[in-house]
């Protein structure tokens, strides 16, 4: 069975990060090997939560797995607590990333033009190094702008879809050039304020060109949707599916999950009802 090492946090509530990646990758026929960056009583959208940083454990995971001669078909990183942890993870990559390993990085730093509480200039510099090593990255538009130094306000100031897609694609091309390799960049959750209908776009910039996927926009920000998207894309790519088709499946899976969740009074921090739709991922 194919194996993926997933570096992300483990939250007791919120169905995000590792609790999103494990079922999704399992449904795709891949063993998820958790590498927890932190443990939380619940994701940070809850009013009350406690957390513990597990940075000191990362070298121990690296050491034990190396001694056990583990091989990974994929490595996938999400939430990181800071630059020190990223540096530990870079050592992990140096140990386990081989010619036949697929590396996906979701450079979690912010959203909607705002940075998260973990953000710092040192985190950004470390995230740039990590992102450049990846075969595929899935930043949202805020994170993509942070990585390139572009203005989020300027990019989102375009009123028409074509100009917004063009500007976003140019940022994606900059990220590909920064990586110095044949990297696929998928910029997620792009919204055009003047669309006649509420759509959200995922824009892929690859060697083949630009691919734009649109899906219905739900005006609620549920926990874990980015983790679900990245997990589907990661698993599909490891299974040999193209980036474009991986995005299509991830978007469809998310649409059905969110639409079902909108039927009840689920709070955004409680995440989406994705479990019943895992069947869509099983082939």
Where does each model-flagged region fall?
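A non-catalytic, amphipathic alpha-helix used as a structural packing/dimerization or gating element
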Residues: 60, 129, 170, 245-253
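Charged C-terminal helix
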Residues: 244-283
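Short, small-residue alpha-helix embedded
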Residues: 146, 220-243, 247
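Conserved N-terminal subdomain of the carbohydrate kinase-like
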Residues: 1-105, 109-117, 275-282
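Conserved phosphate/ATP/ADP-binding segment of small-molecule kinases
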Residues: 118-210, 241
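Short pre-catalytic strand/loop immediately N-terminal to key active-site residues, enriched for Gly-Thr
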Residues: 12, 210-224
């Amino acid at each position: 069975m194919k194996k993926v090492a997933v570096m992300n946090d483990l939250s007791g509530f919120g169905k995000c990060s590792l609790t999103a990646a494990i079922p999704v990758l399992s449904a795709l026929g891949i063993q998820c090997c958790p590498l927890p960056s932190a443990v939380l009583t619940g994701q940070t959208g809850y009013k009350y939560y406690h957390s513990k940083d597990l940075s000191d454990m990362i070298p121990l995971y690296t050491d034990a797995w190396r001694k056990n001669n583990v091989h990974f078909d994929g490595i996938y990183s999400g939430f990181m607590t800071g630059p020190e942890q990223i540096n530990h993870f870079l050592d992990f990559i140096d140990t386990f990333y081989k010619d036949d390993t697929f590396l996906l990085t979701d450079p979690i730093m912010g959203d909607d033009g705002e940075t998260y509480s973990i953000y710092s200039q040192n985190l950004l510099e470390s995230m740039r190094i990590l992102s450049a090593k990846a075969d595929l990255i899935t930043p949202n538009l805020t994170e993509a702008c942070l990585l390139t130094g572009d203005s989020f306000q300027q990019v989102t100031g375009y009123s028409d879809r074509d100009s917004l897609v063009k500007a976003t694609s140019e940022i994606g091309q900059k990220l590909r050039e920064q990586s110095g390799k044949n990297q696929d960049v998928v910029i997620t959750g792009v919204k055009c304020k003047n669309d006649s209908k509420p759509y959200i776009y995922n824009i892929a910039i690859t060697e083949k060109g630009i691919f734009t996927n649109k899906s219905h926009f739900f005006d609620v920000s549920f926990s874990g949707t980015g983790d679900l998207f990245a997990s589907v894309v990661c698993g599909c790519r490891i299974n040999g599916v193209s980036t474009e088709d991986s995005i299509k499946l991830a978007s469809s899976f998310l649409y059905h999950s969110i639409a079902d969740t909108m039927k009840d009074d689920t709070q955004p921090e409680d995440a989406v009802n994705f479990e019943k739709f895992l069947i869509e991922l099983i082939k």
